[in-house]
Amino acid sequence: MGAMATVLQADGFRVGILLPPRVHPPRHVHVARSCRTRGAEVVLLLPQGPAGVVVRTVFGMRDADVIAAVWLVEANGALLMRAWRTYHGGTATE
């Protein structure tokens, strides 16, 4: 995996966005539990229009942590969208 920028740390989670040139649509974030199983991660698609956050892939993360990660990303959606645009440009619809 390429370099990743940490754009949010809260509630024991680290939220990151892959840095260019490693970009692949759709817009998404990688969320890891800071103090739990090493390597556990969930990839969440950022909201598009009326659709909310969508779980794309889960790697070894407990269901309760996945739910908490979704809530965290939903609560910080505007911040994460700005971060995506900062690193990848455009309207963040990619």
Provide a role label for each language-model segment.
Residues V7, V29-V31, V73:
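Hydrophobic aliphatic residue packing
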Residues V15, P20, H28, T91-E94:
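Residue-level detector of solvent-exposed, low-hydrophobicity positions
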Residues V15-P20, L45, G77, M81-T86:
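Broad hydrophobic/π-residue packing in well-ordered secondary structure
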Residues P20-D63:
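A short, structured beta-strand/loop element
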